[in-house]
Amino acid sequence: MAFVYRINIQPSLNSELHIMTKARKCLISVDATPYYHCVSRCVRRAFLCGTDDHSGKSYEHRRGWLEDKLLKLPEVFAIDVAAYAIMNNHYHTVLHINSSKAKSWCDEEVVERWHQLFNGNVLSQRFIRGDNLTKVERNRLQISINEWRSRLQSISWFMRILNEAIAREANSEDDCTGRFWEGRFKSQALLDESALTACM
């Protein structure tokens, strides 16, 4: 059984429905639309939630893993979760890229947010400690900050961190290794209000 969660976001989109079928690098474009429908599916008869009819084992607690991540990651990313639905072996989510939010962050906030996900690098650690950086070091750090700001508004990075975390927990619980997800997530741009409403 699916659990659907929605947040009311008022879209300002075109009136004509369009479906994008380009490669992923072209598919996700904030210039086209900030809204995307993403789907990830499990492999090897793995369970994301629900109960295995053969063994009787319940995996319903895994729903909580995914929900927790879906609600916490937007606190770090400039990406909002507009809706999601969790099925036994896959999940859907509607994501909204908030690029204006990412642009509003100062460099220090970008570094602090990135450090919630990764360790950063030596320069970013020194920067947060308040160490004095040389001009060359500051320029090098700025390159990293610009890249991190971009990643913090990237659906690919959002989904990567989300799915890797769930895969690690599930593989540990199942006492196995290998892929938990069926390849990379699938995404579709929601280019108008009709598409967004239908998906929600």
Say what each PLM segment does.
Residues 1-200:
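Short catalytic/metal-binding and nucleic-acid-binding patches
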